[in-house]
Each structure stands twice: as structure tokens, then as C-alpha cells.
């Protein structure tokens, strides 16, 4: 609207730009014989121009405005279509004299006064006839600055108006004031008259000259004292009348009186504004650092003794006199001596600001000094505050000094801080820092900015990034160099106690919370006692361990370069008190109210000691210990684990902005990359060279470590689904071609579990030895790194390196790995690649991650051990491995046929413990490859049968087993775990009794473990039902001919028949089976086996666990 005060007139009136564009407009109008008369630059400029040209007086502009409003209301149907919004509200706004108007009002005025409007807008451009009503009279206007209208007259108007004006003033002074004007005009020299005439060339030049003079001399609102330019102001000693009167009396000069009156009132308002601004900026008693008192340019220090509208009275310290300076030059920012503890002031924008303590000095040297900062919290140094490394403990009254780099940062910040009353200056400065961050924003923009900031902080809290929670709080550092996080620890130095003073605990906690959310500190070198230095590269030197009350005892010392065996790690040496009340320096006093984990938590698979090259903050019940030298120290309890939520938090950011998107590693070209092998070299030489792959697995590791309660599937699967959705929506996006292994890459066949390719590895791996055929129980603590490693099928087929199943690993860390047999080749099974997530024959139906994940959920990528009952149903023996089985018959895996008889007979405790212990014992005996002797007859029969078949050599397994496995391999469309032995033909069974003992006792033993004793009084009915279904008597004689009586079963469970039934006549009609015949294993009653192994590979033992 209004142009800025004191701005050059060309900017205000130039229709297209700066001052040089304004002069061509005046020249163009003169060329056309026209003259532009300036009009007051306010909202009534149009009505002023029309009032002068129609009513011959600008003072009647309000009358013209009200007449226009009435005309618009009376002719509403003509103008309402051109008004946005409510027409009545628009007319109500027009009643304000400062409301700017436009085309609608010009059309109304044209119809009201029956005059067409012609408007000049640009130089050398024909004017615009905005109203074409064909009225004979015209109103000429000049449009400039996008909203301002000036009057355009013929150039003869200026000359005639100058003559009329001189006659009018001459009559006024001679007849009214009784002044002989003719003598005064004759007494003036010709040069002075010419100067008066030249000074009138353009009113805009007068305004511009005045503005330049003001800008040069009126610094900070103070005007130069005396009459430096007497020709511009008031009466001169040589002239009896003012310059303005003499100008009005000159017949050759036209004086724009209306514009001069508006300009004078504008300058008076400017003086009042300066006075208010000076009152806000200065007060009596403030200290001025640099005051220019004479013309030689010398600067001196002074105290302000008076604040007035124009000139301020100051007392010079060097001269000992009071002066009214012409101006106050602010000192350079580098030499400011900022005293903390006072509020800053907010003068007008563009002016330099000083702290009021810079002028008055510290009033109370014993008052606590707080750290000022003009930067918002997001830009502050992590430890922005008072530099306390340069003062001694005795000079308590001396002010702390700041480095020049910090002053430069302070000078870059705009001066947008207001001054507060003295009673408010004791408040914490943090509030002003936060307010300055949002200064100048509308309420909507401020709320939007705060919402974005809160969303970002929430995302940091969810991801528990190390950047969001530093190892050391910077606010506690800025308070005092020896201040500890524990309030019970006494302060060591005297100046810290002096500075402690009246520090408010709540404000300190708030600063801790803010800094711990924003800052991230690192320790770069060993600190010195009672020394605190904060460098500009955001690296802090922490107080030495002597500041702490006591040190936490570290575990057994080891050399840094020593290899750390991780197969049997010791539990973390952290006392229970640390879990209950951790005293971490950066932990805020008020933690989020999330459900925390149990006190017995611990990172899974983390060794007891890790050599740490930097200063490691170890938590203890009393203090924090900083160790700057390279020593193995206990793994610290992470703050993330203390506040780890039990359930996943909601996703706040877009899936496409997630650092783990698209849920799988991509190379630099954007193609899907195969997961790299484990990095075993301590130097990191075997890390991937591709930064994208390294970044993905780094982010995945940070998130998995920060959120141990979340399965990686819970946040990788939605990202993968989003990527697949993007591929469907945008066909140009290439669909990734998935490799065979969608989770882990198969390890090199030459590398075994016990041999590490790198000599300086972090850890060495070796298979756990079995004692007396049993695997040792898992230790009560975090599982070893050796357990979750994925073993490729090549190693499994060779019979070594198989890992035992540990129940603790499943319960603590579900969903971390896939089973070993997951790498089955997809060739020949499907034309299309399988998705890494979602429904597939490996993982089963996988829904989108719900808000709560149970521990036993079939969608999880559970670790791939065949002993894991949750994953038995999904285990498939790869076709390339089926023909290379070299394991003895009695050591067949549970997932292929049935439970091992040797395991059942040799470990009677497994019948009580369930499938977990049984599986672990069975696999351990299989790994050792030993055939344990047993006193029972069934075990001896198995040994005899297996001994004869094992002599045939590798690559020639028993015919019975291979035929049972190879035949359904080609008939099944999908890899499924089934009871393959039921499809063989009767003539292939050479010894039915022995073969039956091979297949049945395992199932019988499982049945005997879980099934209650039941009577078999319905046997005859079941047999009759079988006969009615079309079975021959030969089938009945073959199947049940050698059945044992109930007294000979040797078990209280529902045993069943110990022999394999023939399959030829059992198939029945061709369409009765999904797989060319039933595969149900019949029992005493003839009912189908309840644990159908096509659907549930877990058998009755697993069902018994969950019932």
C-alpha cells in the first residue's frame, strides 16, 4: 500500500521500476505538453485526484468516496458481478479512508460525473482509455507503483497556477499579516531567487533529497543537532520569511501545497515512530560503545543520559562532558562484550541491536549468568553457552569471553529480539531462542512449522537414531564444567558453585531434553581436569574421570587386537540397578511415557566385550565414566533399549521416504542386489564397495538394533509392497528380477563354519560339541553369534556344521533368519519369480504387518532350522540334494520322515520336555554321525537294516527312501513337506517288517508322547467301513495281518499298526485325491491322521504343545 517512509520517490511513483524509470515518465509527459502533479500516497489517492479535477479541491476526497459508495449500492446490479465475495462487506470496507480502490470505482466515478478516464501507465506508451462512455470531458491520471494515482494536467496549468498562487500569498501577507512582500522580494539576490526556483523543479526530487539526508544523518532515530541546512528548514537569520513562503510568493514557482502538507504529517509520524523505537532501544543509563562527537571521525565511549524524539544527550567517559551527538555508530560485532543473563531487545528490522547490559554493565556480579544465543534451537551449537575455559576460579566477577567464531554466528542472525522489563530478564533465555525461530511468521505458518518439527522429532524418537540421542548432554556441559548428571555428586570447583546460583531445575531439564533431541556430540581427545572447551566442529571435550564420583568396574582386560570368541559369550556385566535407574548423561529427566522392557533385557547376540576406539560412555548407578584410551569396555546399555516400546509405533513418514525403501538392497544402477556375505575382517576390507548396499544394511542394522522387539519383516514388508505397487502404477519402472535366494546369499562352498577366511576376524566360529550324544543346554543369556548364521544346503548335505536349535533364540529374536533349506531353486517350478515377501510356498500367507505380532506367527521369516517346530511345515529338501543323501537311515531328519527312534529311546526326558529338546538332541546325534547302542529290540533292528544299506556307498541311498522321495517330486506342483513313503508300491518293499519299523516307530513314539489312552472297541466298525468302501480282503490281510495286540504295544498312547500299508489298492478312485491318492496314515480306528503332514509338518508333537 503505502510506500516506505523516506524511500526515493521514484520507487513510489515509477510505474515500472526504480528512479531512472520515473524520470522518463516526466520527460514523456513534458514532451506531450503535460505536467504530473503528485498526490498523497495513501488509499485515497484516486479520490483525491478526482476531487481536485471535478470539485477543484483535494480536501473533499472523503465526500467523493462516500458518493461513490452510495452509487455502487444504488446500482448493485451493474457492479456486483465484478466483486469477489459479499457485496455488502465490500462496500463496508470501502468506507475506510485508507482502503485502496481500482477499476470498479473508476467505472462508477465515470458514470457519476460523466467523465471518461484516461490513464498514463508507462513512458513512451499511449494512454489507456479505461472508460469508453463517450463523455466529452476527461480525467487524466498517471498510474504508478501498482496502486497509486497522480494527477496529469496540461503544462500551462503549472504556469498559471504559479502566478495565481503568488498573487494569493501576496494578498495574504500584505493585507492580513501587514508585511511588505515587495521589499522582501526585491531585497533578495537574483541567485537566491533562481535557487528557489530550481529547488522546485520536481517535488519528487525534494522528497528524495530529504530521504537521503535522513538516511545519512538520522542514525538510530537521532537527528543532527543545529541547522546544518538552514535553507530546508524554518527561518534563516538573513531571511525574514521562511523558504516555503518565499517559494509561494515567487510567480515562477508552483508549490504543491497539498502534497507538502501530507509529507509533513508523514514526517511527524515518522518522528513519533523513531521516538518509540528509541525508547525501546535505549534508556537512560545505557552504555554506548562508539559515539561520534566531532567531525574528525573519532569514536568514543559514552553513557546515554537522555532519550528524546530527535536528539539524545550522552555523557562521554573520555571527555567527561555531556553532548548531543549527531549520530551513534554501532560497534563492530567482533568487539561486543555480551553479558549473559539479560534479555535482548527487538528494535526495528534492519537496525543493529545491543544488549542493555552492554551499556549499563553488570549490576550484580554475583547473579547467575546464563548463556544467551541469538540462534534458534535447531541452529545452535550443541553446547552453545558461556565459554568457561578462560577464567580462573578466583575471578568470579569477571565476564566470560566468547570466541570470534561465535560472534560471527551471532552477527549473522537478524536482530529480531525484543527487550523485556527487568523483572523478566531473570527468565531463561531458551524461550527467546525458540521464539526467535518462529519470529515473523503468521499463526498458521507457525503452527505448520511446529507440526513439521514435531513430526520430525517423533520420527527420530521412533527410529532411535544415534543422532537424536547423543552420548553426552550438551546442556549439562554449558551449565558448569564439573556439573554431573547425578545431583548427589558434589561440585568440585568453586566457580561452578558460584554459577549454580538460582538455576531453575525445570528449565535445565527442558534444555537437556531439547539438546538431547537435536545435538550429537563426539569426544575427540583426552580431556584435561577442570577444563571444558567447545570447538566449532561440534566436538566436545568432556570432563575427565576425576570429575566422577566413582568408576564402574570394567570386565576382565583383553588386548584390543585379540580375537573374541563368541560361541559361548558371558552375559553382560551390568548390574540390575542400571536397568532400573540408569544414569546416562544424555538421558532426559522426563522420559517418554512408553512401556519399557523388562529389567532382564539385553541386546541379543552381542559379545561381552568389544574393543572400543573412542571414548565410551558406560552407565553406572552414580556417574558416567569416560575412557579415552583403547581398552575393551563392557557394552553400554543403550538408551534406546531403556525406552524401547513393546509394540511398533505408527508410521509417520511416507513409505517412499523411508531410508530402507524399497525393502531390499539396490546397487548404484538401481538394480536389485544380492545380499553380501558376512563381514569377518576386523579392518573392514570385505565390506561391500557399493555405498548403496552398505547404506541399506547399515540402516537395517541400526533399526534392528534400536528396535529389537520388532521383527525386520514388520517394516521391510510394507516397503516392499509399496515398491511393488509403484511398479504396477508406473509401468516404466523396471520390475526387479529376484535371484534364487531372496533373503541371504549362499556362502561359498569352500568356507565352512569352523574356518574363517580372515585372520583378524572379530570372532571365530566353531560347532558346538556334543557330550554323550547330547547338545549342551543354551546358556541363560544372549545367544552366541554362532547360532543364527545361515548354513547353506551344501554344508548340510555333508553332515557337518549343522546348528542346534535354541529355544531362547526364538523367543528373544524371532524373525531374524530363514531356514537353511530356503534356497530351493525356483527353476521349473514357476515361470515368474517369487516375491521376497507375501504369499509363497516358503513363508505361507503373509498379511500386512498388524499392530501386534505374536511370538508364533507363521508369516514371520523364522530362523531356518529343521528342528524349529514352527517352520517344519515349510521345509523342503531341494531336488538337487535328494539324490545325494549320504546320511545313515536312522539319522534322517525329522522333517523328512519322522522322529528319530534313537533320539526317543536314548533321551526319555524328551518325552516330557516336548519337541524342542527332542529336536535338539536328535540333530546333535545326527551331526556327530554316531549310531548309539540301545538295549531295545527296535533299535537293534534299525541298526541291522541301516547297516546293510549304508555299505552301498555315497550317492546310493536305500532304495526305499529314495523311491519314496523321488516319485512325488515330479508330480507336485509346489514344494511341500509330505509323508513321501506312502507312495511306494508293495512289490518294492522287500522286508515289510523292517520297512514298517523304519517308518512307524517314530510316529508311534510321537503319538505315545502326547495322546491319551483310548479304548479300541470300535475296531470292527472301522474295518467294516473299510470293506464297504471297496477294499479287498487281500488289502485287509496285508495291512492288518501282523498287527500287535494292545498288551504288546509297550506304550500307553494310541499307538497304531507297526507296518506300512500297501498303496496300490488304497488309492481308490482317481479323482479322490489331490496328489493321486490319499496319504493319510491310518491308526487303530482307521481315521485319518489328525496331523496331516501336507499341511502341518509339525506332527502330533507340535499340536500337543499348543493345546
Swiss-Prot record:
May I ask which residue range the UniProt record assigns to the signal sequence?
Answer: none
Activity regulation note: Phosphorylation on Ser-202 and Ser-204 induces 'Lys-63'-specific deubiquitinase activity.
- What does the entry list under GO cellular component? cytosol; nucleus
Q: Which Pfam families match?
A: OTU
Gene3D superfamilies assigned to the protein according to its UniProt record, in alphabetical order: 3.90.70.80
Give residues where Phosphotyrosine occurs.
120, 438, 459
Please describe the post-translational modifications of this protein: Phosphorylation at Ser-202 and Ser-204 activates 'Lys-63'-specific deubiquitinase activity. Induced upon stimulation with IL1B.
List residues modified as Phosphothreonine. 131
Chain intervals with Polar residues compositional bias: 226-236, 1032-1041
Give the Enzyme Commission number.
3.4.19.12
Give the recorded effect for residue 45 to A: Abolishes 'Lys-48'- and 'Lys-63'-specific deubiquitinase activity. Impairs 'Lys-63'-specific deubiquitination of TRAF6 substrate
Does Nucleotide-binding count among this protein's keywords?
Answer: no
Where composition is biased (Low complexity), the residues are: 392-403, 473-486
Provide the positions where the record notes the PTM Phosphoserine: 126, 128, 166, 199, 202, 204, 340, 442, 544, 895, 1000, 1005, 1016-1017, 1042
Modification type N-acetylmethionine: residues: 1
Under the heading CDD domains, the entry gives: OTU_OTUD4
Q: What happens when the gene is disrupted?
A: Mice are born at sub-Mendelian rate.
Per UniProt, subunit arrangement is: Interacts with MYD88; the interaction is direct. Interacts with ALKBH3; the interaction is direct. Interacts with USP7; the interaction is direct. Interacts with USP9X; the interaction is direct.
| Protein purpose | Deubiquitinase which hydrolyzes the isopeptide bond between the ubiquitin C-terminus and the lysine epsilon-amino group of the target protein. May negatively regulate inflammatory and pathogen recognition signaling in innate immune response. Upon phosphorylation at Ser-202 and Ser-204 residues, via IL-1 receptor and Toll-like receptor signaling pathway, specifically deubiquitinates 'Lys-63'-polyubiquitinated MYD88 adapter protein triggering down-regulation of NF-kappa-B-dependent transcription of inflammatory mediators.
Mind telling me what this protein is named? Answer: OTU domain-containing protein 4
Q: Name the species this protein comes from.
A: Mus musculus
Amino acid at each position: 500500500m503505502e510506500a516506505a517512509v523516506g524511500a526515493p520517490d521514484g520507487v513510489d511513483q515509477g510505474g515500472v521500476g526504480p528512479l531512472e524509470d520515473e524520470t522518463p515518465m516526466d520527460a514523456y509527459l513534458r514532451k506531450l505538453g503535460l505536467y504530473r502533479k503528485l498526490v498523497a500516497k495513501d488509499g485515497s489517492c484516486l479520490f483525491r485526484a478526482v476531487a481536485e479535477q471535478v470539485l477543484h479541491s483535494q480536501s473533499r476526497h472523503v465526500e467523493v468516496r462516500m458518493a461513490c459508495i452510495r452509487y455502487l449500492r444504488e446500482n448493485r446490479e451493474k457492479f456486483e458481478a465484478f466483486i469477489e465475495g459479499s457485496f455488502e462487506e465490500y462496500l463496508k470496507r470501502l468506507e475506510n479512508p485508507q482502503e485502496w480502490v481500482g477499476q470498479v470505482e473508476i467505472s462508477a466515478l465515470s458514470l457519476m460525473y460523466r467523465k471518461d478516464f484516461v490513464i498514463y501507465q508507462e513512458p513512451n506508451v499511449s494512454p489507456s482509455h479505461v472508460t469508453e462512455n463517450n463523455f466529452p470531458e476527461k480525467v487524466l491520471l498517471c498510474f504508478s507503483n501498482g496502486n497509486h494515482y497522480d494527477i496529469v494536467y496540461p503544462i500551462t496549468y503549472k504556469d498559471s497556477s504559479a502566478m495565481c498562487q503568488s498573487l494569493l500569498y501576496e494578498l495574504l501577507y500584505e493585507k492580513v499579516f501587514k508585511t511588505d512582500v515587495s521589499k522582501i522580494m526585491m531585497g533578495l539576490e537574483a541567485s537566491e531567487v533562481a535557487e528557489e526556483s530550481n529547488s522546485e523543479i520536481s517535488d519528487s526530487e525534494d522528497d528524495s533529497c530529504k530521504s537521503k539526508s535522513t538516511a545519512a544523518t538520522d542514525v538510530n532515530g537521532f537527528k543532527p543537532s543545529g541547522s546544518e541546512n538552514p535553507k530546508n528548514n524554518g527561518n534563516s537569520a538573513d531571511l525574514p520569511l521562511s523558504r516555503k513562503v518565499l517559494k509561494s510568493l515567487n510567480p515562477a514557482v508552483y508549490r504543491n501545497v497539498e502534497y507538502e502538507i501530507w509529507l509533513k504529517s508523514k514526517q511527524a509520524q515518522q518522528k513519533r515512530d523513531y521516538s518509540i523505537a528509541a525508547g525501546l532501544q535505549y534508556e537512560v543509563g545505557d552504555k554506548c560503545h562508539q559515539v561520534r562527537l566531532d567531525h574528525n571521525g573519532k569514536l568514543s565511549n559514552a553513557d546515554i543520559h537522555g532519550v528524546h524524539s530527535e536528539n539524545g544527550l550522552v555523557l562521554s567517559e573520555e571527555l567527561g562532558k555531556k553532548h548531543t551527538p549527531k549520530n551513534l555508530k554501532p560497534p563492530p560485532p567482533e568487539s561486543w562484550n555480551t553479558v549473559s543473563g539479560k534479555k535482548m531487545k527487538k528494535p526495528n528490522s534492519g537496525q543493529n541491536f545491543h544488549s542493555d547490559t552492554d551499556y549499563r554493565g553488570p549490576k550484580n556480579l554475583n547473579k547467575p549468568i546464563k548463556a544467551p544465543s541469538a540462534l534458534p534451537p535447531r541452529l545452535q551449537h550443541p553446547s552453545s553457552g558461556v565459554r568457561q575455559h578462560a577464567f580462573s576460579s578466583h575471578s568470579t566477577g569477571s565476564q566470560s569471553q566468547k570466541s570470534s567464531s561465535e560472534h560471527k554466528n551471532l552477527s549473522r542472525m537478524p536482530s529480531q529480539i525484543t527487550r523485556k522489563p527487568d523483572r523478566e530478564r531473570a527468565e531463561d533465555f531458551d524461550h527467546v531462542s525458540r521464539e526467535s525461530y518462529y519470529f515473523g511468521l503468521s499463526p498458521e505458518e507457525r503452527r505448520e512449522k511446529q507440526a513439521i518439527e514435531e513430526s520430525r522429532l517423533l520420527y527420530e524418537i521412533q527410529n532411535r537414531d544415534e543422532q537424536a540421542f547423543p552420548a553426552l548432554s550438551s546442556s549439562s556441559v554449558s551449565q558448569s564444567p564439573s556439573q554431573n548428571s547425578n545431583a548427589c555428586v558434589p561440585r568440585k570447583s568453586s566457580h561452578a558453585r558460584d554459577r549454580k546460583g538460582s538455576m531453575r531445575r525445570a528449565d535445565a531439564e527442558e534444555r537437556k531434553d531439547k539438546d538431547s533431541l537435536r545435538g550429537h556430540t563426539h569426544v575427540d581427545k583426552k580431556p584435561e581436569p577442570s577444563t571444558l572447551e567447545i570447538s566449532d566442529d561440534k566436538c566436545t571435550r568432556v570432563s575427565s574421570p576425576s570429575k566422577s564420583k566413582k568408576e564402574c568396574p570394567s570386565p576382565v582386560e583383553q588386548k584390543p587386537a585379540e580375537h573374541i570368541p563368541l560361541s559361548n559369550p558371558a552375559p553382560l556385566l551390568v548390574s540390575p540397578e542400571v536397568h532400573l535407574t540408569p544414569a546416562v548423561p544424555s538421558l532426559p529427566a522426563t522420559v517418554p511415557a512408553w512401556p519399557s522392557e523388562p529389567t532382564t533385557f539385553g541386546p541379543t547376540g552381542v559379545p561381552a566385550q568389544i574393543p572400543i576406539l573412542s571414548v565410551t560412555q558406560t552407565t553406572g548407578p552414580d556417574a558416567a565414566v569416560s575412557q579415552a584410551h583403547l581398552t575393551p569396555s563392557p557394552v553400554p546399555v543403550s538408551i534406546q533399549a531403556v525406552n524401547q516400546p513393546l509394540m511398533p509405533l505408527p508410521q509417520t513418514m511416507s513409505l517412499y521416504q523411508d531410508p530402507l525403501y524399497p525393502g531390499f538392497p539396490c546397487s548404484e544402477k538401481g538394480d536389485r542386489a544380492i545380499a553380501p556375505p558376512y563381514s569377518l575382517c576386523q579392518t573392514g576390507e570385505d565390506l561391500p564397495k557399493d555405498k548403496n548396499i552398505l547404506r541399506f544394511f547399515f540402516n537395517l542394522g541400526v533399526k534392528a538394533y534400536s528396535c529389537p522387539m520388532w521383527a525386520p519383516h514388520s517394516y521391510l514388508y510394507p516397503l516392499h509392497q509399496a515398491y511393488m505397487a509403484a511398479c504396477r502404477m508406473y509401468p516404466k519402472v523396471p520390475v526387479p528380477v529376484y535371484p534364487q535366494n531372496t533373503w541371504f546369499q549362499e556362502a561359498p562352498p569352500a568356507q565352512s563354519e569352523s574356518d574363517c577366511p580372515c585372520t583378524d576376524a572379530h570372532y571365530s566360529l566353531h560347532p558346538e560339541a556334543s557330550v554323550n550324544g547330547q547338545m549342551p543346554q543354551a546358556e541363560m543369556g544372549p545367544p552366541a553369534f554362532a547360532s543364527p548364521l545361515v548354513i547353506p544346503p551344501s554344508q548340510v548335505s555333508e553332515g557337518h556344521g549343522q546348528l542346534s536349535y535354541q529355544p531362547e533364540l526364538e523367543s528373544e529374536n524371532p524373525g531374524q533368519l530363514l531356514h537353511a533349506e530356503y534356497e530351493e531353486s525356483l527353476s521349473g517350478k514357476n515361470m515368474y519369480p517369487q516375491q521376497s515377501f507375501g504369499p509363497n510356498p516358503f513363508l505361507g500367507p503373509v498379511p500386512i504387518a498388524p499392530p501386534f505380532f505374536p511370538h508364533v506367527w507363521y508369516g514371520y521369516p523364522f530362523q531356518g532350522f529343521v528342528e524349529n517346530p514352527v517352520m517344519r511345515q515349510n521345509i523342503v529338501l531341494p531336488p538337487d540334494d535328494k539324490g545325494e543323501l549320504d546320511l545313515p537311515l536312522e539319522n534322517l531328519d525329522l522333517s523328512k520322515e519322522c522322529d528319530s527312534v534313537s533320539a526317543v529311546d536314548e533321551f526319555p526326558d524328551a518325552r516330557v520336555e516336548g519337541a524342542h529338546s527332542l529336536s535338539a538332541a536328535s540333530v546333535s546325534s545326527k551331526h556327530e554321525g554316531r549310531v548309539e547302542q540301545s538295549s531295545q529290540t527296535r533299535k537293534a533292528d534299525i541298526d541291522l537294516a541301516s547297516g546293510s544299506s549304508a555299505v552301498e556307498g555315497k550317492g546310493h541311498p536305500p532304495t526305499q527312501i529314495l523311491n519314496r522321495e523321488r516319485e512325488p517330486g515330479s508330480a507336485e506342483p509346489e514344494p511341500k513337506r509330505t509323508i513321501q513313503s506312502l507312495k511306494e508300491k508293495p512289490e518294492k518293499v522287500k522286508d515289510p517288517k523292517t520297512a514298517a519299523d523304519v517308518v512307524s516307530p517314530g510316529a508311534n513314539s510321537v503319538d505315545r508322547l502326547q495322546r491319551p489312552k483310548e479304548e479300541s472297541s470300535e475296531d470292527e466298525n472301522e474295518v467294516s467301513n473299510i470293506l464297504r468302501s471297496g477294499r479287498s480282503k487281500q488289502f485287509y490281510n496285508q495291512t492288518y495281518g501282523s498287527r500287535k495286540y494292545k498288551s504288546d504295544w509297550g506304550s500307553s498312547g494310541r499307538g497304531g499298526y507297526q507296518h506300512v500299508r500297501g498303496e496300490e489298492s488304497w488309492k481308490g478312485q482317481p479323482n479322490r485325491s489331490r496328489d493321486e491318492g490319499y496319504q493319510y496314515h491310518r491308526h487303530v480306528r482307521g481315521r485319518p491322521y489328525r496331523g496331516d503332514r501336507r499341511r502341518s509338518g509339525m506332527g502330533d508333537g507340535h499340536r500337543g504343545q499348543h493345546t
